[in-house]
Design a protein with these regions (language model features):
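Intrinsically disordered, low-complexity polar/charged tails and linkers
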Residues: 1-151, 155-159, 163-183
Length: 183
């Protein structure tokens, strides 16, 4: 399916089993030139232009593994490559890995101008917030999917986040185009 928007980021997650010690990961990052910052319960790693957040495993639930978040990918192929890169970083064999897409960030243009403040003032029935700051933007949430949100700018640019389903994003974007047209 062809979408009328561009994917700017995919946030994915992976369950790593067995768990891996933070000290070992920090050492491997140092050896391979990856940027790694340690926090109490997580490691923030930047490697090969991707960001990884590795969380500590749960000690109360043995063999539960660890949670890894991945960002900085614009396609599922890039996500799979990032997972392979991370596995190489920690010295694990690459192969098939189950991952989940948690969120897409997308951008597009609408083909008509919107008076953001007027739209905000005349649509109290919608979940909408108008930000009047230096770079004005209108935050508009989907009436069908409460986590799905668009930021609409006076430049006609639209950023959409809050779904792991591209068809939901496409439907929301088409709804935005319809609801913002002045009759």
């Amino acid at each position: 399916m062809t979408y009328s928007f561009t994917i700017t980021n995919i946030k994915s997650s992976v369950k790593l089993k067995p768990s891996i010690e933070f000290d070992f990961v920090v050492q491997r990052c140092h050896e391979l030139g990856a940027s790694c910052k340690r926090f109490r319960n997580l490691l923030s790693i930047h490697y090969k232009k991707k960001s990884f957040v590795l969380f500590k495993g749960c000690k109360r639930v043995p063999n539960s593994g660890q949670h890894l978040n991945i960002t900085g990918c614009r396609s599922t192929n890039k996500t799979l490559q990032a997972i392979e890169d991370f596995n190489r970083l920690i010295g694990r064999p690459t192969g098939s890995v189950n991952y989940r897409i948690d969120n897409y960030s997308c951008t597009s243009q609408i083909d008509h101008r919107i008076d953001l403040e007027s739209f905000y003032m005349s649509n109290s029935n919608l979940r909408v917030v108008y930000n009047r700051e230096n770079f004005p933007g209108l935050f508009l949430w989907s009436p069908k999917k409460p986590k799905l949100c668009a930021t609409i700018y006076h430049t006609k640019k639209v950023n959409i986040v809050g779904s792991n389903n591209l068809e939901e994003i496409e439907d929301f974007f088409n709804w935005i185009k319809d609801v913002t047209v002045i009759n």
